[in-house]
From Swiss-Prot:
InterPro entries to which the protein is assigned, alphabetical: NADH-Q_OxRdtase_suN/2, ND/Mrp_TM
PANTHER family, per database record: NADH DEHYDROGENASE (PTHR22773)
Native source species: Methylococcus capsulatus (strain ATCC 33009 / NCIMB 11132 / Bath)
EC identifiers of the protein: 7.1.1.-
Bilayer-spanning residue ranges: 8-28, 34-54, 71-91, 102-122, 123-143, 157-177, 200-220, 232-252, 266-286, 294-314, 325-345, 370-390, 405-427, 443-463
Quaternary structure note: NDH-1 is composed of 14 different subunits. Subunits NuoA, H, J, K, L, M, N constitute the membrane sector of the complex.
One Pfam assignment: Proton_antipo_M
Family: Belongs to the complex I subunit 2 family.
Name of the featured protein: NADH-quinone oxidoreductase subunit N
A GO term, aspect molecular function: NADH:ubiquinone reductase (non-electrogenic) activity
Domain of life (superkingdom): Bacteria
Keywords: Cell inner membrane, Cell membrane, Membrane, NAD, Quinone, Translocase, Transmembrane, Transmembrane helix, Transport, Ubiquinone
Annotated stretches, region: Disordered: 473-493
Length: 493
């Protein structure tokens, strides 16, 4: 293996070494704080390797793995998100007796799976990366073994993930049986004839069904509210951000390589999934009295917004499609981390602060925490001066440019419904204070929330740096198309 290849693989090597180091530390001497600092050190070391990997990118390291600026953008996003989740885990799990340090090993391995997933260039690596991510998530979801709800959530996720993996493997087999290839590039070479390849087209739809499960797209969403509610809140934060963002980034890489935009049937299916996900997610969120379930249904709607941007921008220019998805995923990730981080900070030793009634009078008990949660909800709603508004503006703008009017109308209707249930939570927090203890915020959780809230505000008020970063992410695979962008003002088979 060449020096350039080793340099490109540095983020994966460092994260793998960090996971092994944490396991050895646990085996030698159990210390929650030591393991936490090893995890943070591993994530920071992974971040420090990204400039070195970028210096040799783009590079096809093997037939399975491609390291390029597209993947490295999401590597940075996922490592930063995992760092925030590690801080939330320190504050959340150290308050609970008999909670062991293995949560940090699982956090590192699941993050490694996300990095592998977004850098996949072959369906085999797609499957391997997805399984590394998913298998690490099973015990994370069921981690609080003393409670029945996390265990139930873990079993549900395990069973339905197995079904999704079956769809994925069967779809891969059908694609290989019809085309004789599994690499994204070689599948793309058959893109013009996919409509005349019914077996391969059916295989792609099965792969889409597996991806739809991971993204909670309707009708593959039924696991989402129960798992979000049952999992420990820091794990829910990871599941809602890194897990979903990595799968969507892979969706963009795979289906653009396969030239799916040439298939009218495929675009119609994606558009239909976007419409029903937006409407179902928002309407079901109206009925919730649990904040975590409300955010679960909200996440379904946000995946629909992302699909809208995927379809509409893909009809215009590929580089605009990448810019739209990259910006929206970054905005959604930081906003969701803030919302779930606030819920995690409010949870006590005995139970999660999950019911809306738990937030009554929060503004009077903890004004700062209420302000952070309010900011995250306003960003999810797409209110101006937040990063969520800029992300939703991207989706709306590309929809108008592409003249996909049914999708644009659905985004407007869904956003209007979303404003109602997000503001319902805000109004609950400013009700007169009842009986309730003042909230004591752990320094780790406070640091994570302060940083995330600052990003929401800064990127909402001054979005151009993040827009530039998203615009500089090349389309996977690179194209020769001239750039069009939005600005703040406008070997194996």
């Amino acid at each position: 293996m060449t020096t350039d290849a080793l340099t490109a693989l540095l983020p994966f090597i460092v994260l793998s070494a960090a996971a092994v180091a944490v396991m050895l530390a646990i085996a030698i001497r159990r210390s929650f704080r030591l393991v936490f600092w090893l995890t943070v050190g591993g994530l920071l070391a992974g971040l420090s390797t990204l400039p070195h990997a970028s210096s040799v990118a783009p590079l096809q390291v093997t037939d399975l793995l491609r390291v390029d600026a597209y993947g490295l953008f999401f590597h940075a996003l996922f490592l930063l998100a995992a760092l925030v989740v590690a801080l939330l885990c320190l504050a959340y799990f150290r308050r609970r007796e008999n909670e062991n340090e293995e949560i940090f090993v699982l956090l590192l391995t699941s993050t490694l799976g996300a990095l592998l997933l977004v850098s996949s260039a072959h369906l085999a690596m797609f499957f391997l990366g997805l399984e590394v991510l998913t298998i690490s998530l099973f015990p994370m979801i069921a981690y609080s073994v003393r409670a029945s709800r996390p265990l139930e959530a873990g079993i549900k996720y395990l069973m339905l993930s197995g079904l999704a993996s079956s769809f994925l493997m069967f779809g891969m087999a059908m694609v290989y049986g019809d085309l004789g290839v599994l690499s994204f590039e070689q599948i793309g070479a058959h893109g013009a004839e996919l409509e005349q390849k019914p077996l391969a087209l059916a295989g792609l739809f099965l792969i889409l069904a597996a991806i739809g499960f991971k993204l909670s797209l309707v009708p593959f969403h039924l696991w989402t509210p129960d798992v979000y509610q049952g999992a420990p809140t820091p794990v829910t934060a990871f599941l809602a951000t890194v897990s979903k963002a990595s799968v969507f980034a892979l969706l963009l890489r795979f289906f653009t390589a396969a030239h799916a935009e040439r298939s009218e049937t495929f675009l119609c299916v994606l558009g239909l999934l976007a419409v029903v996900s937006i409407l179902a997610g928002n309407l079901l969120a109206l009925l919730q009295v649990s904040l975590k379930r409300l955010l679960a249904y909200s996440s379904i709607a946000h995946m629909g917004y992302l699909l809208t941007g995927f379809v509409a921008a893909g009809l215009l220019r590929r580089d605009l499609q990448t810019e739209t998805i990259a910006f929206y995923l970054a905005a959604y990730t930081v906003t969701s981390l803030t919302a779930f981080g606030a819920i995690s900070a409010l949870s006590d030793d005995d139970r999660e602060s999950d019911r809306l009634s738990d937030y009554a009078g929060l503004f009077w008990r903890s004004p700062w925490l209420a302000a952070v949660l309010t900011l995250s909800l306003l960003s999810l709603a797409g209110i101006p001066l937040t990063v969520g508004f800029v992300g939703k503006f991207y989706v709306f703008a590309v929809g108008v440019q592409a003249e996909t009017w049914p999708l644009v109308a659905t985004v407007v209707i869904g956003s209007g419904i979303g404003i109602y249930y997000y503001l319902r939570v805000v109004l609950t927090m400013i009700q007169p204070a009842g009986v309730g203890q003042r909230v004591t915020l752990h320094p780790a959780a406070g640091t994570a929330l302060a940083a995330a809230a600052l990003v929401i505000l800064a990127a909402g008020l001054f979005p151009q740096p993040l827009i530039d970063a998203a615009a500089n992410v090349p389309q996977p695979p690179p194209t020769a198309d001239s750039p069009q962008r939005l600005t703040a003002t406008g070997g194996l088979p």
